[in-house]
Amino acid sequence: MISHTAPHKAVVLARGLGSRMRRAAEDVALTAEQSRAADAGVKAMISLDGRPFLDFVISALADAGFTDICLVIGPEHDLIRDHYDGVTKQRVRISYAVQAEPLGTANAVLAAEEFAGGDRVLVLNSDNYYPAEALELLHEVPGSALVGFTREGMLKHSNIPVERIAAFALATADAEGNLA
């Protein structure tokens, strides 16, 4: 039976191959640290302002009240494990679930089944940043929920090119906010 109390656990999917990231982009210079993460195919470990991007994701989760984090990684992702095993964590506990092969999102979530137990969990990708305010809303919702952004909001407040906005997943909600 699944608990209906506010979740304190988050599953962060960090198993992707990063195959698109491994291709060189024109006019983009990477630091040695960024190159190492790119070569390993671990997008979440690309350095931003001297810290892995995943640090910002975990910090936002902690700010929103999530205390137990499970990173779903591949067996070859020592870069992630070495980093988080080597840093002091004051606001969160980090554990790992290994997805042996990259068989998709549902399989990655399944890899974290033991971590979830009977508790509610938040599931998010390691290479997407959600503001703590959005995560707080998910923390407080009594049932299932997702974060969605309006097309207008994406156009106005993101750095995503207009032509890519149409390529994103589209969710439709009814007047009460239920997925339609």
Explain the meaning of each model-derived region:
Residues 1-123:
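Conserved N-terminal catalytic core of the sugar/cofactor nucleotidyltransferase
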Residues 131-180:
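Conserved core of the sugar-phosphate nucleotidyltransferase
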Residues 126-129:
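The conserved acidic donor/metal-binding loop of glycosyltransferases
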